[in-house]
Swiss-Prot record:
InterPro entries, A to Z: KH_dom-like_a/b, RbfA, RbfA_dom_sf, Ribosome-bd_factorA_CS
Subunit structure: Monomer. Binds 30S ribosomal subunits, but not 50S ribosomal subunits or 70S ribosomes.
Lineage, highest ranks first: Bacteria, Bacillati, Cyanobacteriota, Cyanophyceae, Oscillatoriophycideae
SUPFAM superfamilies, sorted: Ribosome-binding factor A, RbfA
Gene name linked to the record: rbfA
Protein's recorded name: Ribosome-binding factor A
Entry similarity comment: Belongs to the RbfA family.
Family matches, as PANTHER family: RIBOSOME-BINDING FACTOR A, CHLOROPLASTIC-RELATED
Record keywords: Cytoplasm, Ribosome biogenesis
Organism: Rippkaea orientalis (strain PCC 8801 / RF-1)
Compartments where found: Cytoplasm
Length: 128
């Protein structure tokens, strides 16, 4: 079992490499249907499994197409990781869609709606 510092380093390295693959190496047109970015990579303690969280900007259909393209390219990503990284075994790769940015955006939108509906009280300004 790898120590937590090594797991963290491998995780950040996988994030960087997969981001580069998304930009330059994955040729599947479905992956280009939505704007994709790697938000986080969770690597198991034994470095055998990597869950790659991606944020996809686009319509629901574009997001679904992009996830299908990513799922079909997992073997390519795993093979490329084995070439680019010095690991005894290349981790099994699973792509998951990260909805946290969408939830955060929705939360900001709701807070702005609340702010607009509440009348400003006397003596209270936004500068405080």
């Amino acid at each position: 079992m790898a120590n937590s510092r090594r797991v963290s380093r491998v995780s950040s390295l996988i994030k960087r490499e997969v981001s580069q693959m998304l930009l330059h190496d994955i040729k599947d047109d479905r992956v280009g249907a939505g704007m994709v970015s790697v938000t986080e990579v969770d690597v198991s303690g034994d470095l055998q499994h990597a869950t790659i969280f991606v944020s996809i900007y686009g319509s629901e259909q574009a997001q679904a197409e992009t996830m299908e393209g990513l799922k079909s390219s997992t073997s390519f990503v795993r093979r490329e990781l084995s070439h680019r990284m010095r690991l005894r075994r290349s981790p099994e790769v699973v792509f998951r869609q990260d909805h946290s940015l969408e939830r955060g955006d929705r939360m900001v939108h709701l807070l702005n709606q609340i702010k607009d509906t509440i009348p400003e009280e006397e003596g209270i300004t936004e500068e405080e």
